[in-house]
């Protein structure tokens, strides 16, 4: 059997990005999936992006990944969430046509060099000298490889639950990977159990659309990918409805029949995507919960009722749906269900997503305790890239918290672990002013170019974009007004004798290049996309300068090593609780210490000061 550099197990969002990244990095890569026709399937909601998640999609695209381009090709309703808030927390989101999305992913994979797609099931891993050396396939037998990326999603020992019905499955209609789960346990890998759920799918033809308020797409859709010049798909509208007292009563009367509340499910579900049963139990005082009716495609009769995830029996699902306005005569195409699956405690991984106890085995996606397409895809990208570099004898790639949301997520997972499905939010990033969705390519594409995974087309597009931005910034910085001149143009500035540039003025509230172009007509030459970038950059300039200093200080302190001989008890002012935790965990650096639960900036300062003082005293006595 042929030897591959990297074998990727699983064809979901993590697996596709992992295989694509590995192949682009020059590794001979095999992607193993149960069904090639299912590659890129959106198992749950038909949408990409959102708050925090949209940042991840842009970062994947900055590395020349798949997700952004596929979402642009399939997007049928683009919306920028948090539009009225600051640029740092705005979240690009696109509802996608499921079939078009799959087709876009498969097309990109099939034309990628160094990549072969294999339809089979991995039933075992080959371990030699305590390292991964390949996999065993159900049909084709032994497949040697230098590294393996495991992206099992909900398939690892997956079980579907609908009421009191339970059966093994990775998702509806597809088998789970039970033997692989057993094998991982045999290697002493710490596995846990999580669950997620999905709502019933409804027939579009049986919904009373005329009585429901509509949600429109943005008038000017903004693509995810730098390579997308224009969104080609027609933009559709969604409808909004709500549950009501009658709905809630039916759920309460049948709550004991829900798989979630009957004791059949052990794993915790995603906190920020609760089932309708959870909503009624935990937020029973509300008179209704909003439901978004989202078409799954332009030529598809299927509607996804976002907000109605459930594991109630089919008869109860029918009853509760018929109490909701617009759904009185609805037909269910597929029942909602919960799915429970195994995951690996991510604290067992390095920050390259390699398993410490089994070198050569990389994990990405829901197997690491995350939830969401975007989180999975971002992990797949990093794992696939590092797997390829490991086999090629190259340095590992680590992405820091101050560089990207990908770095924030990986650091959270590896340092803190998970007890419930992890979802990305902008609030998780300390340096979110710097980690905006609009500057993902500026942050990451030069790195991707150094790694050799960026196409010639993308690099040219990136350079042209940066050139336009540099020229626009320079123009704004060359145009000045005195306070008196500013007042003459109706601009409110301090009369302090300081001349201010157009760039400086853009930091003022309600200021724009459009307004300043009445003073300086040459600003009209800046194209609309570049205008937005310059305005955001200027608006945040003062804060970004301070944040850059904070990042440098953090990086300097993070690199400070904690000696193994450190006498924690001698550090005055440190709580006994933290002393105990430090002794137990034995952090090797300040970067490790700051992840300890309960650690504060003040406590870190005490540790840093103590270590530096000890070093000075040692140097004097030497």
Curated annotation (Swiss-Prot):
GO CC, any one term: cytosol
Molecular function GO terms recorded: flavin adenine dinucleotide binding
Binding residues annotated for NAD(+), in chain numbering: 269-283
GO biological process, one term: tRNA wobble uridine modification
Record family assignment: Belongs to the MnmG family.
SS bond list: none
Function: NAD-binding protein involved in the addition of a carboxymethylaminomethyl (cmnm) group at the wobble position (U34) of certain tRNAs, forming tRNA-cmnm(5)s(2)U34.
Quaternary context: Homodimer. Heterotetramer of two MnmE and two MnmG subunits.
Record lineage: Bacteria, Pseudomonadati, Pseudomonadota, Alphaproteobacteria, Hyphomicrobiales
Protein name: tRNA uridine 5-carboxymethylaminomethyl modification enzyme MnmG
């Amino acid at each position: 059997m042929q030897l591959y550099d990297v074998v990727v197990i699983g064809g979901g969002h993590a697996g596709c990005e992992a295989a694509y990244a590995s192949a682009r990095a020059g590794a001979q890569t095999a992607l193993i999936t149960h069904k090639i026709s299912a590659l890129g399937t959106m198992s749950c909601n038909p949408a990409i992006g959102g708050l925090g998640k949209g940042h991840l999609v842009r970062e994947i695209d900055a590395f020349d990944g798949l997700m952004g381009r596929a979402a642009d090709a399939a997007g049928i309703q683009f919306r920028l969430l948090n539009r009225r808030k600051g640029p740092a927390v705005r979240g690009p989101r696109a509802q996608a046509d499921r079939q078009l999305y799959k087709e876009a992913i498969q097309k990109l994979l099939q034309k990628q060099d160094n990549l072969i797609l294999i339809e089979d099931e991995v039933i075992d891993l080959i371990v030699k000298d305590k390292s991964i050396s390949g996999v065993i396939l159900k049909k084709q037998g032994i497949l040697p490889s230098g590294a393996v990326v495991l992206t099992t999603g909900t398939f690892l020992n997956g079980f579907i639950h609908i009421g009191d019905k339970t059966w093994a499955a990775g998702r509806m209609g597809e088998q789970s990977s039970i033997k692989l789960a057993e094998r991982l346990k045999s290697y002493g890998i710490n596995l846990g159990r999580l669950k997620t759920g999905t709502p019933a799918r409804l027939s579009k033809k049986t919904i009373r659309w005329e009585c429901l308020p509509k949600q429109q797409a943005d008038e000017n859709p903004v693509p995810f990918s730098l390579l997308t010049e224009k969104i080609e798909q027609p933009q559709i509208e969604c409808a909004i409805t709500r549950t009501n007292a009658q709905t809630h009563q039916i759920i309460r009367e049948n709550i004991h029949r829900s798989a979630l509340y009957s004791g059949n499910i052990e794993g915790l579900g995603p906190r920020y995507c609760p089932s309708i049963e959870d909503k009624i139990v935990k937020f029973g005082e509300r008179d209704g919960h909003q439901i978004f009716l989202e078409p799954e495609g332009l030529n598809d009769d299927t509607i996804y009722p976002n907000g109605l995830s459930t594991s109630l029996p089919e008869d109860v699902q029918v009853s509760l749906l018929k109490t909701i306005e617009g759904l009185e005569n609805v037909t269910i195409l597929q029942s909602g269900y919960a799915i429970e699956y195994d995951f690996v405690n991510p604290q067992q991984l390095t920050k390259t997503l390699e398993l410490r106890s089994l070198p050569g085995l990389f994990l990405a996606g829901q197997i690491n305790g995350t939830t969401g397409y975007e989180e999975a895809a971002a992990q797949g990208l990093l794992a696939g890239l590092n797997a390829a570099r490991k086999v090629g004898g190259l340095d590992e790639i680590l992405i820091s918290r101050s560089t990207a949301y990908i770095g924030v997520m990986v650091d959270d997972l590896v340092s803190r672990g998970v007890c419930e499905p992890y979802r990305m939010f902008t609030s998780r990033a300390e340096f979110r002013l710097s980690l905006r969705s609009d500057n993902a390519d500026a942050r990451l594409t030069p790195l991707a170019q150094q790694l050799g995974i960026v196409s010639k087309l993308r690099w040219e597009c990136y350079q042209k974009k940066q050139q336009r931005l540099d020229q626009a910034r320079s123009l704004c910085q060359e145009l000045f007004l005195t306070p008196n001149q500013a007042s003459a143009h109706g601009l409110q500035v301090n009369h302090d004798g300081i001349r201010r540039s157009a760039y400086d003025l853009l930091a003022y509230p309600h200021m724009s290049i459009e307004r300043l172009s009445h003073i300086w007509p040459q600003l009209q030459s800046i194209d609309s996309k570049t205008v937005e970038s310059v305005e955001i950059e200027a608006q945040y300039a003062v804060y970004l300068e301070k944040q850059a200093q904070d990042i440098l200080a953090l990086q300097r302190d993070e690199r400070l090593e904690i000696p193994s001989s450190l006498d924690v008890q001698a550090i005055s002012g440190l709580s006994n609780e933290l002393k105990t935790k430090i002794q137990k965990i034995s952090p090797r650096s300040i970067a490790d210490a700051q992840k300890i639960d309960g650690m504060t900036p003040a406590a870190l300062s005490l540790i840093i000061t103590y270590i530096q003082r000890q070093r000075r005293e040692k140097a004097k006595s030497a």
